[in-house]
Amino acid sequence: MNNLTLSLHRERRLLVLLGLVCLALLAGALYLQYVKNEDPCPLCIIQRYFFVLIAVFAFIGAGMASGAGIAVIEALIVLSAAAGVGTAARHLYVQLNPGFSCGFDALQPVVDSLPPAHWLPGVFKVAGLCETVYPPIFGILLPGWALIAFALIVVPVAASLLRHRGRLR
């Protein structure tokens, strides 16, 4: 095996790991929803969509054989995670500024009208308000943890893209 083959093999394994981590984060959100009775708000659901999108892209990328294909998938992962950073930051802002609303009435119908909300309402249906603050985990609010997770996805995947930018040729 040459270095490029080894690099692609390692990259694909890391993409599988990333997909599994995103699914584990979604499982954690469902645990909080159903066991701890912490209802998801519109911004929570949007963050779930981004974690699912990242997982889907990661699993697709793990099945690709070409470096250029993996690079395109990694770019989609970076875009999804960056959008997740923005959503989580907005959610954190809403929770840290009492009296400020996420626009529950405006966002809920939009989020609830998306097809996955009809296919899997237990996962993607809005049931709470964005300004509801649930007990922090290790001193960090839930949107803060989502922000950290999305940032920890953006940075290494973007670094991988930059490190392997020759694959696009």
Curated annotation (Swiss-Prot):
Q: Which residues lie on this side of the membrane: Cytoplasmic?
A: 1-14, 65-71, 164-169
Keywords, comma-separated and alphabetical: Cell inner membrane, Cell membrane, Chaperone, Disulfide bond, Electron transport, Membrane, Oxidoreductase, Redox-active center, Transmembrane, Transmembrane helix, Transport
Please name one Pfam family that this protein belongs to.
Answer: DsbB
Cystine crosslinks: C41-C44, C102-C130
Which segments does the topology annotation call Periplasmic? 32-49, 90-144
Q: What is its main location?
A: membrane
Compartments reported by the entry: Cell inner membrane
Position of the signal peptide: none
Q: Which is one GO molecular function term here?
A: protein-disulfide reductase activity
- Keyword Methyltransferase listed: no
Membrane association type = Multi-pass membrane protein
TM regions (residue ranges): 15-31, 50-64, 72-89, 145-163
Q: Which SUPFAM superfamilies match?
A: DsbB-like
According to its UniProt entry, the protein's GO biological process terms are:
protein folding
What GO CC annotations are associated with the protein?
A: plasma membrane
Function field: Required for disulfide bond formation in some periplasmic proteins. Acts by oxidizing the DsbA protein.
Q: Which family does it belong to?
A: Belongs to the DsbB family.
Protein name per UniProt: Disulfide bond formation protein B
Instruction: Tell me what organism the protein belongs to.
Output: Burkholderia thailandensis (strain ATCC 700388 / DSM 13276 / CCUG 48851 / CIP 106301 / E264)
Gene it is expressed from: dsbB
